[in-house]
């Protein structure tokens, strides 16, 4: 079923971007290989970066892309690897680059960072274009020791970058959009982020179709890695009951930490579907790729600010996210029709002051 809620694109911004780019006559580059530096990638971090990766491949389709996690591991080499097949050619983890900007880095790690000025990291490999995604000054100085022809970094208003944005450039608040801006600056052109579906192995979508064969589903993701970001479970259950009353089917996304809620929710909302558990659970079909495939089959969703929310957004499902203490602007979903509800609009940072009835009215809008 086609999504009923449409997104109004800001075409004036696009036109303005093109005019400014022409005025500044930015030289376009054609890198045969690109390195992207990050400190690390947890699941949520990685999903926020996914629009940037797709945009980078869109504007540089023939370039080999190497993803460098300077200080820790990257989920793009693990649970998120199915999402970047054909987009990222190589992932280098724990490259020992960038510890100097981490407050809890030990003495040896900091010394190794300084050694990078003498012995360039990544075995001295050189890249045509090196993109630094973080903005800590000392870390950027270390990242620049990776050999390169062109360097792009937003640190200190692009002070260290030899590729500059157009004049009057305004950095986006949203983290995903901010990263996409780096790809725009590198290519010298405005980018329309490729919409879903993502390139997934067929096995994920086949199982998702078995689990969710109908078309009137509403996703519910009640968990979060940071429990202080969680709307109370009772609120989610009240929303689920309203969904059932309106002849729709609630689909609960429960991670390992929420498994203990499974039986309780089943008892409260018997009609609920739990596609990641029970008869649908497969050892080789799970994780973010499966959640994204499921999200392609639901009409809309409600969630906390969480990694699961980013997965649902990556599946192209409009999502309603509730926020309390954390600010919504940075983490608002990019899917057309997505909405953030900020408890500050109700005069408080207490997320539970957002009432289920208010959420129900918003969810109803996706079925009109």
Model-derived features with residue positions:
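Catalytic machinery of carbohydrate-active enzymes
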Residues: 2-368
